[in-house]
Amino acid sequence: MEFSQKLYQAAKPIINDIYEDDFIQKMLLGNIQADALRHYLQADAAYLKEFTNLYALLIPKMNSMNDVKFLVEQIEFMVEGEVLAHDILAQIVGESYEEIIKTKVWPPSGDHYIKHMYFQAHSRENAIYTIAAMAPCPYIYAELAKRSQSDHKLNREKDTAKWFDFYSTEMDDIINVFESLMNKLAESMSDKELEQVKQVFLESCIHERRFFNMAMTLEQWEFGGKVND
């Protein structure tokens, strides 16, 4: 079994939990609250900006010009390619995407996720650690979306179905490249090192779950603690 497949197998329980959590279940039914979608889009805008920067940090770690070319293309996709998915949710909210993301948010779950990825990029010379931190994002979106296509709960009369349709196909290229890179880099690593990479991958899967849940709770920093009326 290739290394990437071992990672996916280990991540299955987490992805199952994400699928059963409120965000995805309400998206399937098409009854998710506008406030949750707005908070998700605002936090995701901040996340995607940093995710794009991480692609740039990966480029110097690449040995192949083809890999560099693909990463540059992915930067362009991050800037423009997910516009359709964002617009689908913005239309449900009833505001333009540009108007929604004028309000900047940086919730704890997004903060911790981004810092997890940057730590791998800055502290590890081997690109596999950064890739392992980034790879769960497209992989989990694709897995959730593909699973939705055969789920009777997917409400085709609601616009949220289009969001699932988008991610059921649009992540395949980056997933394949991340798989190829990880499998190639894993060949020269020890079992102990590969276990560390697996840990990085699974931590990002947990961060993905917390990110979706963050939208449902409208998560914010509670610097003053919770006030009990």
Curated annotation (Swiss-Prot):
Substrate binds at residues 44, 141, 167. One of its GO terms (cellular component) is cytosol. Pathway: Cofactor biosynthesis; thiamine diphosphate biosynthesis. GO terms for molecular function: thiaminase activity. Keywords: Hydrolase, Thiamine biosynthesis. It catalyses: 4-amino-5-aminomethyl-2-methylpyrimidine + H2O = 4-amino-5-hydroxymethyl-2-methylpyrimidine + NH4(+); thiamine + H2O = 5-(2-hydroxyethyl)-4-methylthiazole + 4-amino-5-hydroxymethyl-2-methylpyrimidine + H(+). The active site is at residues 137, 208. One of its GO terms (biological process) is thiamine biosynthetic process. Its EC number is 3.5.99.2. Pfam families: TENA_THI-4 (PF03070). NCBIfam families: salvage_TenA. Belongs to the TenA family. Catalyzes an amino-pyrimidine hydrolysis reaction at the C5' of the pyrimidine moiety of thiamine compounds, a reaction that is part of a thiamine salvage pathway. Thus, catalyzes the conversion of 4-amino-5-aminomethyl-2-methylpyrimidine to 4-amino-5-hydroxymethyl-2-methylpyrimidine (HMP). Is also able to catalyze the hydrolytic cleavage of thiamine; however, this thiaminase activity may not be physiologically relevant. Therefore, is probably involved in the regeneration of the thiamine pyrimidine from thiamine degraded products present in the environment, rather than in thiamine degradation. This is Aminopyrimidine aminohydrolase. It comes from Staphylococcus aureus (strain MRSA252).
